From Swiss-Prot:
Keywords linked to the UniProt accession: DNA-binding, Transcription, Transcription regulation
Pfam families named in the record: GreA_GreB (PF01272), GreA_GreB_N (PF03449)
Gene Ontology biological-process annotations: DNA-templated transcription elongation; regulation of DNA-templated transcription elongation
HAMAP family: GreA_GreB
Function statement: Necessary for efficient RNA polymerase transcription elongation past template-encoded arresting sites. The arresting sites in DNA have the property of trapping a certain fraction of elongating RNA polymerases that pass through, resulting in locked ternary complexes. Cleavage of the nascent transcript by cleavage factors such as GreA or GreB allows the resumption of elongation from the new 3'terminus. GreA releases sequences of 2 to 3 nucleotides.
Name by which UniProt lists this protein: Transcription elongation factor GreA
InterPro entries: GreA/GreB_C_sf, TF_GreA/GreB_CS, Tscrpt_elong_fac_GreA, Tscrpt_elong_fac_GreA/B, Tscrpt_elong_fac_GreA/B_C, Tscrpt_elong_fac_GreA/B_fam, Tscrpt_elong_fac_GreA/B_N, Tscrpt_elong_fac_GreA/B_N_sf
Domain of life: Bacteria
Family: Belongs to the GreA/GreB family.
Amino acid sequence: MQRYPMTPQGHAALEAELKQLKSIDRPRITASIAEAREHGDLKENAEYHAAREQQGFCEARIRDIEAKLGGAQIIDPATLPKDGRVIFGVSVVIENMDTEEEKQYKIVGDDEADFKAGKISVNSPIARGLIGKSEGDEARIETPKGVVEYEIMKVIYD
């Protein structure tokens, strides 16, 4: 079974999404299909086909979430040693050594990642380049624009 690392917050968010899909979205889509069937000929019934497509997406997402929750490896950074190392679940402040621009990222599971909110996947190139390093260390990270060197300014265990 594949393991899916996630924070307790990420696990709770997936459970909430699953509950929404099963208790609200699935019944709504089923009702839409039943209503569209009443309109007659299913071959040329766009509403019916759209509702069936929605049902397919909904069921696929339910299966995906159930698989991830079943293989969830919940990692609470609050319970891990706070030794200044970059690990899953921490926030890290890095400085681009060329531009001196500072950025802060929180390293989270794939489903929690939101780059605009400063949350990066543990599987992203930046996170992979930072994991295991400590405050003051330098990291060479390969990006689409080439290799970028960062200095780890601070590790925050939140």
